[in-house]
């Protein structure tokens, strides 16, 4: 736990919500007004930029007047480039954030090979530049955030590690080790990037590296320059939400190019969802010892190719195919076909590759055959979710490739085998919808089925598991049973 003023960060404390003022810090009245409005909106930690020593000095009056107005939220100074500004700011606010990429380094974009001794000399220089701030923070009881930015890594880091998540992590850990050498541990780390995929990998790697080194510093999560409107909220939700779902993150900020108080409701929603996930996890009786996903490298799961059409295949290194559910269905097959064709005309680059419809009874078979013929080769695959008996299913007709979506439970081995072989015989594909328990029980049978006519899916998350966790567990079962059907 790191105390930022009276606000505890990390440990069993709630996930804290942060934001940042957008005013000129030297305009004390305007900055104070934003701090007050943020506090009233529910912001728990407020960050203020201090680009120079004059701005850092202005923090004294801002802090005094903020407290005089009756607000207790801690203030944080955001420092780039100038150690002198950091030394001034630490006197007035509860926390100082520094960027290890530019705190003691000027960006020269120089290409240089560092020998081990030359690199060690650079670290000695860092130690000398950062130590005064660490010692003053320790003396005053302040906290520091080591905040790496993907876009501002130092030349030293770039030349040794490249423009990578590993470089981001190592950049922060260099400063952490300096702080620890002085017995200072009131640190928070962040690994921000404008690319959610980069920041997700960097935070996961930071957590893994800290675990290896017996470190447990809190993490502040954020996507830099997310933008505005719905796109910015989605971008932040992808980055921050993915990490919160991993159990990572102690404070968050959703960075919007809007008035800063608009960030708070978005943060609150993300925190609420993370809290619900955490509560579900505590109450779940389903626990798995190891996550099969590799957090630090991306590779596609090898799988057998499934042919929807001459130009559309699924599995292995093919593009991930997108299946959409018809909003109309078989009750009006002509309108359902028109809906797809109109979508193709409006968005020629975004074609429907698979259309999902329900076939609840034999009464709709004629409509299914008509829809299939109407779609022809326009839609490569027609996914048909059904509960009708195998003997009644209409494999006849022409048009889109038929993919039968059928649920199977533990003990349905014979039915599964019959459906799979009948689909293969009729040039159709079976999409077996199974839960984790069923996948375990049916694994031996699944391993005997023709993989080129088989897809594995699940539409119902296992109790106590998020949908992602359910799919990962099913894939683990498939891999252990050497079943390479696409998922």
PLM regions: where:
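N-terminal amphipathic alpha-helix/helix-capping segment at the start of soluble metabolic enzymes
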Residues: 1-19, 134-140, 276-334
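N-terminal glycine-rich anion-binding loops that anchor highly charged ligand groups
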Residues: 3-18, 23-42, 46, 52-54, ...
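Conserved, mostly hydrophobic/aromatic
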Residues: 17, 78, 146, 189, ...
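Short, glycine-rich nucleotide/cofactor-binding loops
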Residues: 22-24, 227, 231, 327-329, ...
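Structured loop/turn residues at secondary-structure junctions
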Residues: 22-23, 51, 81, 194, ...
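Active-site beta->alpha loop and helix N-cap motifs at the rims of alpha/beta catalytic domains
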Residues: 28, 43-174, 306, 312, ...
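Catalytic alpha/beta core domains of metabolic enzymes, predominantly
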Residues: 114-130, 135, 155-309, 397-400, ...
